[in-house]
Every structure is written in structure tokens, then in C-alpha cells.
From Swiss-Prot:
It is a peripheral membrane protein. It comes from Anaeromyxobacter dehalogenans (strain 2CP-C). Binds 2 [4Fe-4S] clusters per subunit. The keyword Metal-binding applies. NDH-1 shuttles electrons from NADH, via FMN and iron-sulfur (Fe-S) centers, to quinones in the respiratory chain. The immediate electron acceptor for the enzyme in this species is believed to be ubiquinone. Couples the redox reaction to proton translocation (for every two electrons transferred, four hydrogen ions are translocated across the cytoplasmic membrane), and thus conserves the redox energy in a proton gradient. The gene is nuoI2. InterPro entries: 4Fe4S_Fe-S-bd, 4Fe4S_Fe_S_CS, NADH_quinone_OxRdtase_chainI. The lineage of its organism: Bacteria, Pseudomonadati, Myxococcota, Myxococcia, Myxococcales. [4Fe-4S] cluster 1 binds at C66, C69, C72, C117. This is NADH-quinone oxidoreductase subunit I 2. Belongs to the complex I 23 kDa subunit family. It catalyses: a quinone + NADH + 5 H(+)(in) = a quinol + NAD(+) + 4 H(+)(out). [4Fe-4S] cluster 2 binds at C76, C107, C110, C113. GO terms for cellular component: plasma membrane.
Length: 264
């Protein structure tokens, strides 16, 4: 009995000791400086300024130094960049960019489009906050079809091409767009479907051509000499007559009994 009580009280003592040991570790963190902060309310500076310079955020295009080479469009492995060029109506020798769309929601931020750009027109920014109600609002259109921009002519001797501050164009777009605005229509409306053609009425069968008149008999040719008659063929031998079948013998009639002379 004493051992049972001693074991019971020892179990209670171990439980209380382990409880306060774990709680002391938790309480020790209350006096420490937190290593995490609540985003985005309590950051000491904008998060984009805390990111490394080579961070790959939203893509930005400086149309002032874009050559329209479409190297970025060809390098994109998922086809999120669409570029269209046309000749300027006023100057046919000058090409203009009528479409430069980047689907930021589809982009995988690989950076392959930035590497082949000869002037650095397209660059990754440190902007990443793009919360929108409609995903189509993340398709950035850097060219206006109604007001296209001319392509930039590259200076082969230039070592640097000045551009606008990196991230300023994307930041301006994100700040002016409401998160719940209606989705734009990027695709042209579908052309109306042509009306189904009714089957044409069957044409009446063509009249049969009239029978041609019989041709006039040709002039009788002079009678040819009669051909010599062929010798008559020898008559074929008559087929041998089959032997007549023997007549069936009729059964003989029974003989009449002889008359008894004593019966007279």
C-alpha cells in the first residue's frame, strides 16, 4: 500500500514538473524580439524595397526603346507574350507595334524573355502584388492598337540605352487599377455565323434527245461471186442400240387335278 501511494504521488509530481518545463520555454519567447512581422501593415518599409535587386516580379516594357524584334515572344516557353507589328500608314518604311500583351497571371517568371532583348526594354521588376477579382486584369497591354508606337532603331555603337526607372510603369498600372473592376475584353468579338443555306430545289430532268433518223441505205455493192460449196459432212454413225432387257417370265399356272375314273 505505501508503495502504491508513493508511485501515485510521484506521477503527479512528474506531470507538474514537465508541464512547467514546457511552459517556461514558451514564456521565454515573450521577451524576445519577433523574427516575423505582419504583412503588409507593420513592415518598416515597402516590401518591394526589401527584396533583392534581381528579384523576378512583374514584367515591364519600356516602349521608348523597344525594337519590335519579337525575340522575347519567341523565347517565352509558355507563350504569355503576344506582339504584332504593322507598317505605318503615313510612312510605309516605318514599322509600328500595335500589340504588346503580357499575361502576368500565366508568366512563370523564368527570365528567358529578358536575356535576348537587345536594349533591355523588357525587364523584371520587384512588384508582385497583383490581387484582382478577375484574372484578365493581369494581362498588361503595353501597346495601344489605336495609337501604336514606332520601333526603336538600335545604335550599334551604344553601350547603354536609357530607360524609365525600373518598376515605375508597373506600379502606376497597379495603383490605378481597382481590384474589383470588370474584366476587359481582349479577344475580338466572334463574327456572326452565316445563315444556313437552304437546299436548292431539284432541277427538272432534261428532255431526252430525239431519236436520230435512220441513215439512208448505202448503194448496193456489186454481187460477189458465189463461194464454192463446202462438201457435206459424213453422217454420224447411229448409236448402237442397247440390248433389250429380257422379258419377265410369268409364273406358270398350277396344273388342274386329274379326273378320278372311279368317281364316274
Amino acid at each position: 500500500m505505501p508503495q502504491t501511494v508513493r508511485a501515485y504521488t510521484g506521477a503527479i509530481r512528474d506531470t507538474v514538473k514537465s508541464f512547467w518545463h514546457g511552459l517556461s520555454i514558451t514564456l521565454s519567447y515573450l521577451a524576445r524580439r519577433p523574427t516575423t512581422v505582419q504583412y503588409p501593415d507593420r513592415t518598416p518599409m515597402p516590401v518591394r524595397d526589401m527584396l533583392p535587386p534581381r528579384y523576378r516580379g512583374f514584367l515591364e516594357v519600356d516602349s521608348g526603346i523597344c525594337t519590335g524584334c519579337q525575340a522575347c515572344e519567341r523565347a517565352c516557353p509558355i507563350g504569355c507574350i503576344q506582339i504584332s507589328l504593322e507598317k505605318d500608314a503615313a510612312n510605309p518604311k516605318q514599322r509600328v507595334v500595335t500589340q504588346f500583351d503580357i499575361d502576368e497571371a500565366k508568366c512563370m517568371f523564368c527570365g528567358l524573355c529578358v536575356e535576348p532583348c537587345p536594349t533591355g526594354s523588357i525587364q523584371h521588376t520587384r512588384e508582385f502584388e497583383g490581387t484582382h477579382k478577375h484574372i484578365r486584369n493581369l494581362v498588361f497591354r503595353w501597346a495601344d492598337p489605336m495609337n501604336p508606337f514606332p520601333v526603336y532603331k538600335v545604335d550599334k555603337n551604344a553601350e547603354y540605352y536609357p530607360r524609365v526607372p525600373l518598376g515605375s510603369l508597373v506600379r502606376q498600372r497597379l495603383e490605378t487599377m481597382a481590384w474589383d473592376r470588370s474584366a476587359p475584353q481582349f479577344l475580338p468579338p466572334e463574327p456572326p455565323k452565316p445563315a444556313e443555306a437552304k437546299p436548292a430545289a431539284k432541277a427538272a430532268p432534261a428532255a431526252k434527245p430525239a431519236a436520230a433518223a435512220p441513215a439512208a441505205p448505202a448503194a448496193a455493192a456489186p454481187a460477189a461471186a458465189p463461194a464454192p460449196a463446202k462438201p457435206a459432212a459424213a453422217p454420224a454413225p447411229a448409236a448402237a442400240a442397247a440390248p433389250a432387257a429380257p422379258a419377265a417370265e410369268a409364273p406358270a399356272a398350277p396344273a388342274a387335278p386329274a379326273a378320278n375314273p372311279e368317281s364316274k
